Design a protein with these regions (language model features):
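Pre-Walker A (pre-P-loop) alpha-helix and adjacent loop at the N terminus of AAA/AAA+ ATPase modules
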Residues: 32-74, 78, 115, 119
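AAA+/SF3 P-loop NTPase mechanochemical coupling elements
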Residues: 156-175
Length: 384
């Protein structure tokens, strides 16, 4: 079978290009509203808080690109949901001055879907594939040639033949929470791999204060910003969502402009109560339901079983609920009349499945005390 090679060329340099962001995937309506509201997402490396080592590495690669005008190496960003993988990828495109094509892997059902993205790219563009581990194995294999030689094969049904198509050079950035689901050969084609770390409370606090200034034109008190950060489950997305709901409550509570002195602890706790977020460690309804389920079953459970029992998608359990529960969580509780401070995970993963820890038990007991004070009125928090 012969190949007919086609060449697509775009003669533009970074300085003459008008950068655009192309979100190939249509996000769920609720997420889209959230992202539109969160237009304070950092646009460049200087605006990104934390991840210093990663930023320094990326700056070096981009400096080389600007000097040689050769595409930056393909990159793989690792880290659980909410640590800023998409933000970092978008910042790379902004720093380079190139177009940013964003696609969710779950929307790529066939090679034709991916080719529709490839045929529109310009020289040195960024293609960002979120949750790249969700790509079908065959599609992962077809990426090899694209990433190495910038060529791909497409089937021409009209001419009943396969064509080898030359495409513009580009940089692929993949984001994943599960490297084990990627082909080893595909992983090896990403020349730069980096682990994005969870944010510290101080970093999240700084994000909250910066967002308050940019979006709401108000100085969020340091004490309030830090408390919101501590309840953000180590992720920027949760911190921004808490700030948004906090400011919505403040706006609804006053006829005039919200001032810094109006942002009080009482108002913050009112917001948390309305949103069913605990003031202890910041867990929401779904996370508490997860823990209650484990505690009641008193046996190891698989992620699929838990997802079914709490009426959530397994991907939500794996990528959104579990990462924080598996991390070290600071908790204070009474045990045998003594105040105990624990810094341990709420769950553990064993060969038989997920099990709850003693910390999870004491956390639910604290939530029961809150329920007696009017919190979580519609939740069943009873355990043995």
């Amino acid at each position: 079978m012969g190949y007919n090679v086609e060449q697509q060329t775009v003669n533009r340099t970074p300085s003459t290009r008008k950068k655009t962001v192309k979100k190939v995937e249509t996000m769920p309506e609720t997420q889209e509203r959230e992202v539109n509201h969160m237009d304070f997402r950092p646009k460049n490396f200087d605006q990104i808080v934390g991840q210093e080592e990663v930023k320094e590495n990326l700056k070096l690669k981009i400096a080389a690109y600007k000097k040689t005008n050769k595409s930056v190496v393909h990159m793989l960003f690792l880290g659980f949901s909410g640590v800023g993988k998409t933000t970092m990828a978008n910042a790379v495109a902004n720093e380079m001055g190139v177009n940013f094509h964003q696609v969710m892997a779950t929307r790529i059902k066939s090679w034709a879907d991916f080719y529709n993205i490839l045929k529109d790219i310009e020289e040195n563009d960024i293609i960002f594939i979120d949750e790249i581990h969700a790509l079908d194995r065959k599609i992962q294999e077809q990426l090899y040639g694209v990433m190495e030689d910038f060529t791909c094969t497409i089937e021409d049904k009209n001419l009943n033949r396969v064509r080898l198509v030359k495409i513009n050079r580009f940089t692929m950035i993949g984001a994943t929470t599960h490297t084990g689901k990627l082909n080893d050969a595909l992983i090896n084609r990403f020349q730069y791999k980096c682990q994005l770390l969870p944010y510290t409370h101080l970093e999240l606090s700084k994000m909250v204060q910066t967002a308050g200034e940019r979006i709401y034109n108000v100085d969020v008190p340091e004490e309030i910003a830090l408390r919101l950060a501590q309840l953000s489950r180590k992720t920027a997305r949760v911190a921004y969502n808490l700030l948004r709901t906090f400011m919505d409550t403040a706006e609804a509570s006053t006829p005039g402009r919200v001032r810094s002195d109006m942002l009080t602890k009482d108002l913050m706790y009112k917001t948390l109560k309305l949103e069913q977020i605990d003031p202890i460690v910041g867990l929401d309804y779904a996370s508490r339901k997860y823990l209650i389920t484990l505690l009641r079953e008193e046996k190891a459970l698989g992620s699929r079983s838990i997802a079914s029992m709490i009426n959530e998608q397994e991907s939500t359990v794996l990528n959104t609920i579990e990462p924080f529960l598996l991390s070290d969580i600071k908790l204070e509780f009474q045990k045998q009349g003594q105040i105990v401070e624990s810094v341990k995970p709420f769950i553990k993963i064993t060969p038989k499945g997920r099990i709850s820890t003693e910390s999870a038990y004491h956390y639910i007991k604290l939530c029961q005390n809150l329920q007696a004070q009017g919190w979580f009125p519609n939740e069943s928090l009873t355990i043995k």
